[in-house]
C-alpha cells in the first residue's frame, strides 16, 4: 500500500435432494444412524506456513473435537518474513533490522475471501484501505467475518537489540533464542471456529510505514485432521467381503485359583500376545457370544449348566442399561477418547434410570435418576470403566462440554450389552420337535442386559475386591467389551458403506448385514436357527462348535508338526519355490564340472602314462629290429 499516512481508515466491508433410497432402507432395517459424533476426538494439527519461502512458522497438534480444537498459535514475525525485507532495512537477517521491524505497526488482509479492489498476492490482498481485517495498528483494524485475529505478543517494543542468545554473551539484555523478538499470537474468531477448513486459508501481512511502500509477506493456515473418517468406496461393495469362516475354534479357559510360586522362584513375565488379525464374520460373532457366555458363567454359573445363547437377526443388536456412576473431568482429551473408541450408532432401547448430562427432553426424562448440568469451561467428561455415554448423536466414551454448550445434545451413562437372548434347553428342543409344545403364552426372552444389568457399577469392571473372582471377572468383562467394540465397528462400517455405495439398488438391499452374517453361520453348521435367532449350545465346558472347526485345528497342528520335523534342506524347498527350479537347472552342469575337477587329473595322468608306455614299446621294437639286422650282417661276414 503506497502513499502517505491516512487519518481515518475506511470501514470494514462484509462481504437437492438427499439419498432417499438409502434412507428408506436404513429406516426399514431399524438402525439409527447419525453423522460422526460431535464429541468424537481427533488428532488436529494447525500449520502456519510462510508462502514466500515455503517454511513452516508454527505446527501445533492437539487432541480435541471439531468444535473446540482451536488453540492459540504462537510464532515470530521473522518466521513469516525471512530475508524478504532486507532491502528495506527491516529484514530479519540482522539484529538492527529485527529491532526496527518491532517499532512499526502491521495489518493483515484475507486472501481466502478477497473483496473487490483489494488486489492479489503482490499487494498482500491489501490493495486499498479497508481491506485489512486484523493486525496491530493505531486504528485497531478488526472484522466481524474474518476467521482469525493476529496481534503482537507480550514483548515490550522498547526492549534492547534483538541479538541471538546463542551467538552473543549472556550478559547482553534483550537477547532471545534465534534473535526472535517480534512474537505474534494468532487466535480464532467465532466465525473461524464455525468455518470449513477443508483447504488452506491465505492472508497477506504488511508493515505500516508513514512513507514509502509497505513491505509485504504472505502466509497460510491449514488444518490437518487424522482419522477423520472411512474412505469412500468406488467399485465392488466391500460390505460382504469379510464374511469369512472362523479361523480357529475359540478356546475357553475356565477360571483356576492362583497357585503360589515356589519359594525362591523368580516372577514370570507373561508373554506378549501376538498381534491381532482382522476378524471375519464367524470369528467376530462367535467372540461376541463367547464373551457373553464368559460373563454369564462367572456371575451366574447355575444358568450355564445347560443353555442356549442366541444372536438375533433383526435390530436392535445392542441394548443399554442406564446406571449411576462417577465420571472424571479432564482439561484435555484423555487417551481413551481416541477415534477408535467413538461410535456414531445410537441406541434404540435404553432401560433403567441413571446419570444424565445436559437438559433432557420430557420424552426421555424417565431415564434420569440424577441430572447434572455442565459448568462453564472447556473440558472432557470421561465415562467410568465399563460404561459409555449414550447421546442422541451416538455412543462416545467422552463428552466435550464445549459441544454440549453449543448444541442441544443430551447424554445418559449406560452399560452396553449385546442383544443375546438366553433360552433353556427344554424350550429350544420343543421348538425343533415334530409336535411342538404349545404354550399358553410365549415365554419371556431373557436377554444379557436383563441378566447382567448393573454389573459394572457393582464393582466387577473396576476390579473391586482382592479375591480371585474379582480379578477373573474383570478379565472376562474386558473380553466381552473388546468383542462388542469390534462388532460395533463392523456394523458401523457396513452402514457407512451403504451410505456411500455407488452400486445398484439390488446390491444395497442384499446388504442386510446381520441377517447375512447369521445365515452364513447357519449354512456353515456353526449354529442352530431358532425362528429369527442363531443359537449356540453352551455348558460348563464352553460353547460347542462344529466338528469341522476341530478338524481344521488338527490339520493345522499336523501341518506345523510336519514342518517342524523337516530338515533345513527340505525347508529350503518349501520356503523358496524358485529354489527348486534353480537347483534343477544348474545341478546337471554343476555335477559334470565337479566330476571333471575330481577325476580329470587322474584320467589325464593315466592317458599320458599310457601314451608314454606305447611310445616306449615302439622305441624298444625299433632298437630290437636294428640290433637284429646288425647281428645278421656280422654272422654273414664271419662265415665268409
UniProtKB/Swiss-Prot annotation:
Cytoplasmic membrane side: 604-640
Cysteine pairs bridged by disulfides in the record: 109-126, 118-131, 307-310, 307-535, 337-391, 356-368, 398-411, 527-534
Positions in coiled-coil regions: 473-509
GO cellular component labels: host cell plasma membrane; membrane; viral envelope; virion membrane
Topology feature Extracellular, residues: 33-582
Swiss-Prot/TrEMBL site (Cleavage) positions: 441-442, 621-622
UniProt-listed InterPro entries: FMuLV_rcpt-bd, TLV/ENV_coat_polyprotein
Domain notes: The 17 amino acids long immunosuppressive region is present in many retroviral envelope proteins. Synthetic peptides derived from this relatively conserved sequence inhibit immune function in vitro and in vivo. The YXXL motif is involved in determining the exact site of viral release at the surface of infected mononuclear cells and promotes endocytosis.
The protein's assembly and partners: The mature envelope protein (Env) consists of a trimer of SU-TM heterodimers attached by a labile interchain disulfide bond.
Function: The surface protein (SU) attaches the virus to the host cell by binding to its receptor. This interaction triggers the refolding of the transmembrane protein (TM) and is thought to activate its fusogenic potential by unmasking its fusion peptide. Fusion occurs at the host cell plasma membrane. The transmembrane protein (TM) acts as a class I viral fusion protein. Under the current model, the protein has at least 3 conformational states: pre-fusion native state, pre-hairpin intermediate state, and post-fusion hairpin state. During viral and target cell membrane fusion, the coiled coil regions (heptad repeats) assume a trimer-of-hairpins structure, positioning the fusion peptide in close proximity to the C-terminal region of the ectodomain. The formation of this structure appears to drive apposition and subsequent fusion of viral and target cell membranes.
Name recorded for this polypeptide: Envelope glycoprotein
Gene designation: env
Amino acid at each position: 500500500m503506497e502513499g502517505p499516512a491516512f487519518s481515518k481508515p475506511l470501514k470494514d466491508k462484509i462481504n437437492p435432494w438427499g439419498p432417499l433410497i438409502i434412507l428408506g432402507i436404513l429406516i426399514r432395517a431399524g438402525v439409527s444412524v447419525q453423522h460422526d459424533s460431535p464429541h468424537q476426538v481427533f488428532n488436529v494439527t494447525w500449520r502456519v506456513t510462510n508462502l514466500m519461502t515455503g517454511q513452516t512458522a508454527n505446527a501445533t497438534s492437539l487432541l480435541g473435537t471439531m468444535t473446540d480444537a482451536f488453540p492459540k498459535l504462537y510464532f515470530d514475525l521473522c518466521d513469516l518474513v525471512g530475508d524478504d525485507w532486507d532491502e528495506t532495512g527491516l529484514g530479519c537477517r540482522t539484529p538492527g533490522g529485527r529491532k526496527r521491524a518491532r517499532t512499526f505497526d502491521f495489518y493483515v488482509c484475507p486472501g481466502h475471501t478477497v473483496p473487490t479492489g483489494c488486489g492479489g498476492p503482490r499487494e498482500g490482498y491489501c490493495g486499498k484501505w479497508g481491506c485489512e481485517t486484523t493486525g496491530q495498528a493505531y486504528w485497531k483494524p478488526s472484522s466481524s467475518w474474518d476467521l482469525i485475529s493476529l496481534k503482537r505478543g507480550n514483548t515490550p517494543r522498547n526492549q534492547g537489540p534483538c541479538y541471538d542468545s546463542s551467538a552473543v554473551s549472556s550478559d547482553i539484555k534483550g537477547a532471545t533464542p534465534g534473535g526472535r523478538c517480534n512474537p505474534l499470537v494468532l487466535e480464532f474468531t467465532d466465525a473461524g471456529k464455525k468455518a470449513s477448513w477443508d483447504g488452506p486459508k491465505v492472508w497477506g501481512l504488511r508493515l505500516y510505514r508513514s512513507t514509502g511502500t509497505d513491505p509485504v509477506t504472505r502466509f497460510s493456515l491449514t488444518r490437518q485432521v487424522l482419522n477423520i473418517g472411512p474412505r469412500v468406496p468406488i467399485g465392488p461393495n466391500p460390505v460382504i467381503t469379510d464374511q469369512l469362516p472362523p479361523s480357529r475354534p475359540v478356546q475357553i479357559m475356565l477360571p483356576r485359583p492362583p497357585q503360589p510360586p515356589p519359594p525362591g522362584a523368580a516372577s514370570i513375565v507373561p508373554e506378549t500376545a501376538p498381534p491381532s488379525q482382522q476378524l471375519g464374520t464367524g470369528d467376530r460373532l462367535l467372540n461376541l457370544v463367547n464373551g457373553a457366555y464368559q460373563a454369564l458363567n462367572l456371575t451366574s454359573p447355575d444358568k450355564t449348566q445347560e443353555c442356549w445363547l442366541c444372536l438375533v437377526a433383526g435390530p436392535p443388536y445392542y441394548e443399554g442399561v442406564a446406571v449411576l456412576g462417577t465420571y472424571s473431568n479432564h482439561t484435555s482429551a484423555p487417551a481413551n477418547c481416541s477415534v477408535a473408541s467413538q461410535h456414531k450408532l445410537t441406541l434404540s432401547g435404553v432401560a433403567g434410570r441413571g446419570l444424565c448430562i445436559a437438559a433432557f427432553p420430557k420424552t426421555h426424562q424417565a431415564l434420569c435418576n440424577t441430572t447434572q448440568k455442565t459448568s462453564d469451561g472447556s473440558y472432557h467428561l470421561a465415562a467410568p470403566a465399563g460404561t459409555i455415554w449414550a447421546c442422541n448423536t451416538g455412543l462416545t466414551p467422552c463428552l466435550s462440554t464445549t459441544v454440549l454448550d453449543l448444541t442441544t445434545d443430551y447424554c445418559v451413562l449406560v452399560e452396553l450389552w449385546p442383544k443375546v437372548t438366553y433360552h433353556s434347553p427344554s424350550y429350544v428342543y420343543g421348538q425343533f420337535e415334530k409336535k411342538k409344545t404349545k404354550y399358553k403364552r410365549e415365554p419371556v426372552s431373557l436377554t444379557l442386559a436383563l441378566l447382567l444389568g448393573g454389573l459394572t457399577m457393582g464393582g466387577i469392571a473396576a476390579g473391586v475386591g482382592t479375591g480371585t473372582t474379582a480379578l477373573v471377572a474383570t478379565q472376562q468383562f474386558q473380553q466381552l467389551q473388546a468383542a462388542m467394540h469390534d462388532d460395533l465397528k463392523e456394523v458401523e462400517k457396513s452402514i457407512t458403506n451403504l451410505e456411500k455405495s455407488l452400486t445398484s439398488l439390488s446390491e444395497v438391499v442384499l446388504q442386510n448385514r446381520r441377517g447375512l452374517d447369521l445365515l452364513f453361520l447357519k449354512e456353515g453348521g456353526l449354529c442352530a436357527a431358532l425362528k429369527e435367532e442363531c443359537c449356540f449350545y453352551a455348558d460348563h465346558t464352553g460353547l460347542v462348535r462344529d466338528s469341522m472347526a476341530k478338524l481344521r485345528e488338527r490339520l493345522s497342528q499336523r501341518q506345523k508338526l510336519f514342518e517342524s520335523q523337516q530338515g533345513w534342506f527340505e525347508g529350503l524347498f518349501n520356503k523358496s519355490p524358485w529354489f527348486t527350479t534353480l537347483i534343477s537347472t544348474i545341478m546337471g552342469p554343476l555335477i559334470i564340472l565337479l566330476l571333471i575337477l575330481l577325476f580329470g587329473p587322474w584320467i589325464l595322468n593315466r592317458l599320458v602314462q599310457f601314451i608314454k608306455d606305447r611310445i616306449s614299446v615302439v622305441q624298444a621294437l625299433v632298437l630290437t629290429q636294428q640290433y637284429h639286422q646288425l647281428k645278421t650282417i656280422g654272422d654273414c661276414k664271419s662265415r665268409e
